[in-house]
Amino acid sequence: MPIIMGMDKQEANGTDKTLLVFNCHEPWVYQLNALDYKLDIIVGLRGKYNKGWDYQMRPLPTRARLIGLPEALRSPTEYYCIIAHNTTDLLDARSRPEPRLIVLHHTLEGRIQEEHSSIDPDKMKEMLHTYVELVGGHVVATSMFKGESWGFTDDIVHFGVDADDYPPYSGHEAAGLRICNFISSRRQILLWDFHERAFEGLPVTLVGHNPDMPGVEASRDWNHLKQMLQAHRFYIHTADPRFEAGYNMATAEAMATGLPVIGNRHPTSPVKHGVSGFLSDNPKELRRFAKVLLEDRGLARMMGQQARKTVMERFSLACFKHAFLRSIEIARRKWRTRKVAPSSFTIDDLPFTNCCR
């Protein structure tokens, strides 16, 4: 696997600590760039739609290299911490002798819904709690909404977005934008029937990996994605409050660019109705709001500026860096309290949720 060029120069200027990171959602992994650690990112994982790094979503972090799981397991590097995203990752890394943490990116209910699983959610929570306590692991949730779903609310670390990474809003293209992967398998979670009723016949651009949807493609790269965000009039996010949060990283990116957001009402939505976007559970009303923004670029720009302020206040990359560095130190302390070695567990000891793959 390739090592990113220029790493030696970066190593001379930064920390020598290295994290072992299972690949997950590339935009989330990319923000680890802010930590200024070296990153060994494990690719070629079972169940992930692509075998390498998805450069259509993000470039590789500056101090990162890509490795396979076998290489990671036999690496002589003393990793400062292992970053996992599901129980499969935890068990795959069970032979490694370093501290570890798992990041919860989804609600338990959402994963069960998407995977059509018959597992008892209470049993799943109990087993994960028991496992991390025994092996001295640490759990980080990306929002309180997701942490409460799993019963882990002690360490909430919101993702970070640097608003300065995004070009200023134009909105010259009178169309809505939605970025989403694998819509067909997540229709209920995304309230897709509601989305279709609200926006059918209106100019809306869908972006993402959706091989069963003709004409829908992922961005060419991050710069192309930024250009699309800059050009479109507003952004769309709909989600079932039982399964999914009222925002995601793409929503925050859109807000950072200065797009107002349109969607259903959700207790966790960062959108303030009538200020930074429009929210409604009535598809006809939401459609009317969309038409207002399509016809009034000035209003869209004004509301988008409020959306941008919200992102800068709530999803600062500096705050993410501070919080996640703290999470790593907590994981290192907990590792010293482990009761059993992770290697004592087998593949049959935990039910699996391939949360990000």
Label the model's feature ranges:
Residues 40-45, 81-83, 95-122, 139-141, ...:
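Active-site proximal beta-strand in glycosyltransferases
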Residues 256-263:
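Short hydrophobic beta-strand element within catalytic cores of glycosyltransferases
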Residues 70-76, 108, 116-139, 146-147:
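Membrane-proximal helix-turn-helix segments that form the acceptor-binding/catalytic region
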Residues 41, 149-152, 160-222:
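Conserved catalytic-core segment of nucleotide-activated headgroup transferases in glycan assembly
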Residues 226, 248-256, 269, 275:
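Short alpha-helical segment that forms part of, or immediately flanks, the ligand-binding pocket
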Residues 230-244, 259:
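Acidic donor-binding loop of glycosyltransferase active sites
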Residues 273-284, 292-297:
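Conserved acidic donor-binding segment of nucleotide-sugar-dependent glycosyltransferases
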Residues 284, 295-337, 342-345, 351:
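A charged, aromatic-enriched C-terminal amphipathic alpha-helix characteristic of glycosyltransferases
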